[in-house]
């Protein structure tokens, strides 16, 4: 109750989620699989001995980048490799994965004729938009600037003027023009954004929000969805999140943690902010102690905690709604009491004076 924007009749816009999954395997995408295998083995070898600072400064940025794009992953490895000891095999397999993806981009027309020849995140997403979301207004978010730069170029090549973008790498004035074009031009169907696109923008004209990558901070997900789920939106038009993620991976754990545990893609976070810091700490702890299954184990506990918090919030919202609804009555009653007291005091004054 009271967790979605509503119209004058009190109706709420619905939220929905659609999973778009792909497999990382030796048979389907060899070098992506090798890159993930090397990264996972390196993390597992440190399990139980990782410090909080190592997770925050090294492991978390690498995992976030890996499950975004090979461009972002290679960039993070290059940055961190200057400061920390990262195994040569981790770096080598990342380079090969990037080369493979760039080869696919150079031959994209052939790849799209047979997507099973290179079923990567990028190829699956292009195919899904072309086949399932044709003609829809779409906002696409990524937290990685390298992913934005790569996808923006590829999408412009594939979809032409239907695509525009907003990011820190685009001139500010040009980015504002791009936002306006997306909002006002019916032929502009896709807006690709980096994390700066999730701040204070009204994108309620869009039908879908696509998450190219999954942030570790759940408030970022809420910000993305909130660009579409705003006051004034047609409540008959649901806000649908399309989440593309790999299966049998840490990314799938994170998706289920957010979706099954907190239902964030279908329900607002309103009132749950108080437990967000604890949740973020649990994610980091899962990497330190049980990278392969830790988040799965936390989901039942998270569901109970979230349900308890939502019940509390609902009770408070009912109280607040009642307070707002009956405030005019309270004011009228207060005025009545003041008037009656004044009359009573006046009558006492008259009686005392003439007795």
Regions found by a protein language model. Name each.
Residues 1-4, 39-42, 46, 65, ...:
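Phosphate/oxyanion-binding loops and surfaces in catalytic or ligand/nucleic-acid-binding neighborhoods
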Residues 7-41, 193-276:
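SF2 helicase/translocase ATPase core recognition
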Residues 43, 129, 155, 228, ...:
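Hydrophobic, Leu/Ile/Phe/Ala-enriched alpha-helical segments that form helix-helix packing faces
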Residues 45-54, 126:
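Short, charged/polar, low-complexity loop and linker segments
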Residues 50-54, 58, 139, 201, ...:
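Short, surface-exposed helix-loop/turn micro-motifs enriched in polar/charged residues
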Residues 235-355:
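C-terminal accessory region of SF2 helicases/translocases
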